[in-house]
Every structure is written in structure tokens, then in C-alpha cells.
Amino acid sequence: DDHDAHGEDDDDHVENNSEVHDDHDAHGEDDDDHDDHDDHDEEGHEEDLAFDPHSWLDPLAFKAQVNLVLENLTTLFPGQEATFKANAAAYIAQLDGLHTDYEAAFSDTGTCSNSTVVANHAAYNYMANRYDIEFITVHGVDPEGEPTAEDVAMAVEYLQEEDVSVFYIEEFTSPDAVKSIVDQTTSSAMPSGVSIQYLYTMELPPSNSDDDYLSLMQKNLVNLKAGLGC
């Protein structure tokens, strides 16, 4: 598709992080090829997840981590087992509710028929895998450093060539780079430039000290839905 073709030209700047979605495009092909596609997609996802540490962006994966913490705490402090279990159960119920909210948007019967997201940070493979969201990463403007003018120009080129109207930015991305991208994507079709929506990976403490995992994951969901129009 167009995204893949562009990726061949600029491998260092654009990456499709959710190869598993290729099998949805291939449903119309011969059944004999279906297993091969599934095998390829599973291998691609295993490779993506192996190099992506952001497992907590999948609420069910995070729930497994909570259970692991619970197991270790009750081993270390058996006298507090009842308290630990009660607290864990209450928190897990909230994680299950969060998962339900994401499924309401991104399941087969969810409200978001479009689930292709163009982002600036390759951090969302676990979320993509759980909720069938396709994340396309535009490299060079990630939050780890200050993007160069060339990095910004490459991002702008991709956004314009692919008619991207919404760009998802990780919270701590350079504000100057974000402003430059918006300014350079201004056109008659987008008088205000590309729309920016923020996503929170929680690699650093939140800028708002009142936020926590649950509130930031809800913000991620709200912003995903806002950008996708669902």
C-alpha cells in the first residue's frame, strides 16, 4: 500500500509498527495463503513486542504485572496478604474497566471504524496488538532528543504526501518541533496545519502531578477517539 511504498523510500523515518493488520487486507486472497499470512503476522508481532518495553500500554498486560507484584508482596509480607489482595482486586477491577472502554472503541463492533494512527514514537505495539490499532511511526521527531531541521522536514514531507490530517505526539516531544510541523503543514486544505493529539507513554513522570496510570490511559483513549473522529 502507499504507506509501505513510502517506507521503502524512507526506512529511517517511517515505520509501520503493526504488521498483523496486513492479514485484514488479505482476506480476499486465496485461502491457501491465509496461514502463511497469519504466521508472518504473528512473527512480526512477536518481533515488535520483543523490542518494545511499553507493555503497560496494554491494560491486560499491566494487570498481569499487578498480579506478579501481588504475588511477591504476599510472599515478602504474609501478614499483610488480605490488604494486598483487597487493594489489588480493586485496582484490577479498574484495569478491566479501562480495557472495556478501549474495546468499546476498537473492537470489531467498536465506534472507531478507522483505526490507523500516525505517531512520532514507536511505543504502541502492545496497544496495537491488543486493540487492532495500526500505528505508523514517523521517526526523527521522537521525544528522546531535539529534532533537527532535516528531521522536521522529513516528517512534514511524509504528512503531506500521505494527506495526514492528525499527528499523534508523545507528551514530551520538543514544542518547537511540533510548532514547526504545524506551521509547515498549513495549506488551503488545512488552514491551521496538521492537527496535534497527544499520547502518554509514561516513561517519565507526568507533567501534571495529579495524573496517574488510569487517568493517562483514559486521556490516551479520549485523544485517540478525537483524532479518529469516533
Please give the residue ranges for each predicted region.
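Extracytoplasmic metal-acquisition and chelation regions
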Residues: 1-230
